[in-house]
């Protein structure tokens, strides 16, 4: 299956030059339902949603949003001060938000994918948490592709006003039997003064999917933005480099990335943070477990203000003789008082550690899984995650317990 345009025999596209014609056209006629009553979904698909942390029929009062192919379903939050609305409808209700937030954190001319989203109808969600409102339970959203070789084009905007807090769990996935498709997303996050926004995103794709998320965040004074990303079943080709602008004084950002890579997959997962606010800080931590694909881990910290402090840590574990991991942590200082550090490590599991654990009664598979679990323990906040999602995350280490080649 050819998914790319080839410019030459020597240069077959890896992260760009996606052949849009290899996929079905984006469906423009989007249907919206302010209820899940009309949702027709198989039990197998419900289980897949739960595995990425999205339970559509629990008792949560924070609201829900599901984009299922070209259909949108959502529930109005039962908590005062939070709203979730399909983006196109939000622009009709609040015309001013388009001027204020639409392609302000992401450049519409960044590449072909942002241009594609810009030229299409606005499909996605608008979430806003009002001033000083603290949402104590996670809000669940999902982007579910259920048609073979389809194209999903999404634009999501999240706004946290001053002093607000929210944990957003988003599952992006394909139907259990699907092989391929193209998923394009623009996400824009605006974290107001003193607010805290945690975004937990889980990807679970079929073997021939191409995925292109384009994300930007703007963080104001004393605010915190945390991005947790898990890739459980990777796409055939995923490339993303989310950008965060720490605009305010004492603004903070943390990226925590965990991914598993398998044969014939390409994962280019990065993150760039511009520390423009005085005494702003950032931490980028990435862990990759490679079973035979190609992984590029990048992280760029830009210190542009007095007192800026940051650290980037990219590490990879090779579980097979095949596959590639490239760790590319980067630092750029444009202010004399910015202080930044980085580290990177790539290797295989030490057989001595496996032998030691076996001497304590574990078999080889259990020992390897335990070591990988420790490698992946990077301090991600798990409060509020459903048990199904916690089990999915644990499976990354358990899969590794099948041994090395």
Identify the residue ranges that each predicted region occupies.
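Conserved beta-strand/loop scaffold segments within soluble protein domains that form the structured core
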Residues: 5, 102-362, 376-405
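Short alpha-helical scaffolding segments that buttress acidic/His motifs in well-ordered protein cores
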Residues: 370-371
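Long, low-complexity, mixed-charge
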Residues: 1-116, 120
């Amino acid at each position: 299956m050819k998914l790319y345009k080839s410019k030459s025999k020597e240069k077959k596209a890896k992260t760009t030059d996606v052949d849009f014609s290899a996929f079905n056209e984006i469906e423009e006629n989007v249907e919206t339902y302010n209820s899940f009553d009309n949702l027709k979904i198989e039990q197998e698909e419900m289980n897949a949603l739960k595995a990425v942390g999205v339970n559509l029929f629990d008792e949560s009062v924070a609201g829900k949003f599901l984009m299922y192919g070209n259909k949108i379903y959502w529930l109005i939050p039962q908590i005062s001060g939070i709203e979730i609305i399909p983006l196109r409808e939000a622009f009709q209700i609040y015309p001013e938000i388009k001027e204020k937030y639409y392609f302000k954190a992401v450049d519409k001319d960044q590449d072909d994918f942002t241009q594609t989203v810009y030229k299409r109808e606005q499909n996605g969600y608008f979430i806003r948490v009002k001033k000083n409102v603290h949402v104590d339970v996670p809000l669940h959203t999902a982007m579910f592709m259920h048609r073979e070789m389809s194209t999903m084009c999404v634009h999501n905007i999240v706004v946290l006003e001053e002093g607000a807090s929210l944990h957003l769990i988003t599952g992006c996935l394909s139907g259990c039997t699907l092989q391929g498709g193209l998923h394009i997303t623009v996400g824009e996050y605006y974290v107001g003064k003193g607010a805290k926004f945690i975004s937990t995103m889980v990807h679970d794709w079929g073997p021939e999917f191409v995925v292109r998320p384009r994300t930007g965040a703007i963080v104001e004074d004393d605010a915190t933005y945390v991005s947790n990303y898990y890739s459980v079943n990777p796409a055939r080709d995923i490339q993303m480099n989310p950008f965060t602008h720490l605009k305010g004084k004492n603004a903070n950002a943390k990226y925590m990335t965990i991914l598993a890579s398998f044969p014939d997959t390409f994962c280019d997962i990065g993150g760039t943070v511009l520390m423009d606010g005085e005494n702003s800080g950032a931490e980028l931590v990435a862990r990759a477990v490679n079973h035979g694909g190609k992984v590029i881990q990048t992280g760029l910290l830009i210190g542009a203000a007095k007192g800026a402090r940051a650290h980037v840590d990219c590490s990879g574990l090779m579980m097979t003789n095949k596959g590639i991991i490239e760790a590319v942590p980067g630092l750029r200082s444009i202010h004399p008082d910015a202080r930044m550090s980085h580290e990177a490590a790539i290797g295989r599991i030490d057989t001595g550690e496996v032998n030691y654990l076996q001497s304590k009664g574990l078999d080889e598979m259990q020992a390897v899984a335990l070591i990988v679990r420790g490698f992946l323990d990077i301090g991600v906040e798990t409060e509020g995650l459903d048990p199904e999602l916690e089990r999915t995350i644990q499976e990354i280490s358990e899969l590794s317990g099948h041994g090395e080649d």
